[in-house]
């Protein structure tokens, strides 16, 4: 037996290994054609079996791998966000196009009844928004040719919101109605409910005292003229206070406030300086609370940076005659608001009644906890009066002519259908009416929507009555049996519709809740939900502040208002508020 040397043995082993590999490759090539692979082949060879190409098969990714699932989630979320942004921009663009390009309207029909609407506030505009103007010849009369979004009015004097951002032209509203409406910029001075005539007065120009007096006959009248600020007969309020109900009021507050700040720069007497920089807000309702909060924000965020000399003397005081501010809110939110004001260094004087006002000093009477009363004197630079309503002269004049209105002081007495007591075909809504509900924008808005549906139903009822009368006349002159059956079937159908249209329910207010901004990016919300019963939800803080903003934006009348308000908020966040006089 021959013994191989180690070198020869190594060569033989190498050749054997090479031969084995060659054999495996040959078998693999054969099995590519047959589509099978023997079980004994290595894993690398098995992976090539059954394929027509020469490349090794790439393993498929594991779809259930956590990283790949996460990647798919974020990619889907990005696509959804991208598509939502495109859809939102498309919708906004469409709405802007519709606003800028109103469609043609039906011409006025002299045969229709004349409906006169007095006012351009929450009640009147909500009424016009829902009214089918093709049923009437509509005439709108108001000295203010725009609708004002009053919940954001306290933000205007400080520059948080530009006043034009919360104004919507009345002509822009009625131009988008189905049929033509007429607008007259004038004051209603007299309402003759017996002759059914409204007398209006309009100035020809600002620089002319010449006036135009016109009488407008009407079939139906909607009175929504609102109310004026009440001074409660307190001496000096009308002459020295700034009110907060209209755009000119907000502009007057701005001028007065900046005048006091600029005067304080020249004043060396510390007491006079403190007086000039002291702003007193009378009224602890939402308007007064929100303005006090906005003013303190204006000082903290802007004034103290650009006018550092006033930082030690600037002061805001809120005066309320009731035991607490925001009386319509829950006790928890009242306490939270008062604590927030204390943290913001806003002074609150509750149970305090103003007795008189002169040019520089407010005299008030405060009731202590033990029932004793103390007289207070508050030097002030700016006085903002944000409490109380009283009826307008045209409403008072109408009330004096109707015996059923003699006992009313708050406004026109109305029944459950908002019809003015003692009249026919005259309705009143909003702050000019006296109901069991609070005089708020929410109440006026719901009254306007209800009244529009009521008037639409009245028009439908009249049309059905006319159609029934015509069918009855037609049946008298028809002798064909089949045609008579068709007429009677139509009469029965229209009679059912007539009964349904007449079955109008009385007005019922649905309270949705109350909101108020309390400063430092915080707000309070007292909301009501009707889910199998009334449910109340109270909240306060920063998250409620963002809810307050989103709610007010959604309540803005038009897409234009929504966009402008959001832009104003962004401008203040980026650049701060303007500190110029105007």
Swiss-Prot record:
It is a peripheral membrane protein. The keyword Oxidoreductase applies. Binds 1 FAD per subunit. Residues 54-65 have a biased composition (Basic and acidic residues). Its main location: mitochondrion. Residues 1-30 form a transit peptide. It is an enzyme of class 1 (oxidoreductase). Alternative NADH-ubiquinone oxidoreductase which catalyzes the oxidation of mitochondrial NADH does not translocate protons across the inner mitochondrial membrane. Belongs to the NADH dehydrogenase family. This is External alternative NADH-ubiquinone oxidoreductase, mitochondrial. It comes from Yarrowia lipolytica (strain CLIB 122 / E 150).
């Amino acid at each position: 037996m021959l013994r191989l040397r180690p070198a020869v043995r190594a060569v033989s082993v190498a050749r054997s290994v090479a031969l084995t590999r060659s054999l495996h490759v040959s078998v693999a090539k054969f099995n590519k054609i047959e589509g099978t692979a023997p079980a004994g082949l290595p894993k690398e060879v098995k992976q090539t079996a059954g394929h027509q190409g020469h490349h090794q098969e790439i393993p498929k990714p594991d779809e259930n791998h956590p990283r790949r699932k996460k990647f798919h989630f974020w990619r889907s979320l990005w696509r959804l966000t991208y598509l939502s942004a495109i859809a939102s921009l498309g919708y906004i663009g469409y709405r802007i196009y519709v606003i800028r390009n109103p469609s043609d309207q039906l011409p006025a029909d002299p045969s229709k009844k004349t409906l006169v609407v007095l006012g351009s506030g929450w009640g009147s505009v909500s009424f016009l928004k829902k009214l089918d103007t093709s049923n009437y010849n509509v005439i709108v009369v108001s000295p203010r040719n725009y609708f004002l979004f009053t919940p954001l009015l306290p933000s205007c004097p400080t520059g948080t919101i530009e006043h034009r951002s919360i104004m919507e032209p009345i002509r822009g509203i009625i131009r988008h109605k189905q049929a033509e409406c007429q607008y007259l910029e004038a004051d209603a001075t007299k309402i003759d409910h017996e002759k059914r005539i409204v007398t209006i007065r309009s100035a020809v120009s600002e620089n002319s005292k010449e006036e135009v007096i016109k009488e407008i006959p009407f079939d139906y009248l909607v009175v929504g003229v609102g109310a004026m600020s009440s001074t409660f007969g307190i001496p000096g309020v009308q002459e020295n206070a700034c009110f907060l109900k209209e755009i000119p009021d907000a502009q007057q507050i701005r001028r007065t406030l900046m005048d006091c700040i600029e005067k304080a720069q020249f004043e060396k007497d510390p007491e006079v300086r403190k007086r000039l920089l002291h702003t007193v807000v009378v009224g602890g309702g939402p308007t007064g609370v929100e303005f006090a909060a906005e003013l303190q924000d204006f000082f903290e965020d802007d004034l103290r940076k650009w006018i550092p000399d006033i930082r030690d003397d600037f002061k805001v005081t809120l005066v309320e005659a009731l035991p607490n501010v925001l009386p319509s809110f829950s006790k928890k939110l009242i306490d939270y608001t008062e604590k927030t004001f204390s943290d913001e260094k806003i002074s609150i004087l509750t149970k305090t009644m103003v007795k008189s006002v002169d040019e520089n000093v407010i005299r008030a009477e405060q009731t202590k906890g033990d029932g004793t009363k103390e007289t207070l004197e508050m030097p002030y630079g700016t006085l903002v009066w944000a409490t109380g309503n009283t009826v307008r002269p045209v409403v008072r004049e109408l009330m004096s002519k109707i015996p059923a209105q003699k006992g009313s002081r708050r406004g026109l007495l109305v029944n459950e259908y908002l019809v003015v007591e003692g009249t026919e075909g005259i309705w009143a809504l909003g702050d000019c009416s006296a109901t069991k509900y609070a005089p708020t924008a929410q109440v006026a808005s719901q009254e306007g929507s209800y009244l529009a549906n009521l008037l639409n139903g009245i028009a439908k009822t009249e049309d059905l009555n006319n159609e029934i009368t015509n069918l009855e006349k037609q049946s008298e002159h028809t002798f064909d049996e089949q045609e008579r059956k068709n007429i009677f079937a139509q009469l029965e159908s229209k009679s059912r519709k007539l009964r349904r249209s007449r079955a109008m329910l009385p007005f019922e207010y649905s309270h949705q809740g109350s909101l108020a901004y309390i400063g430092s990016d915080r707000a309070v919300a007292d909301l009501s939900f009707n889910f199998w019963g009334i449910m109340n939800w109270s909240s306060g803080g920063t998250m409620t502040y963002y809810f307050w903003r989103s709610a007010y934006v959604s309540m803005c009348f038009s897409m234009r208002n929504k966009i402008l308000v959001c832009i104003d908020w962004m401008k203040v966040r980026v650049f701060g508020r303007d500190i110029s006089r105007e």
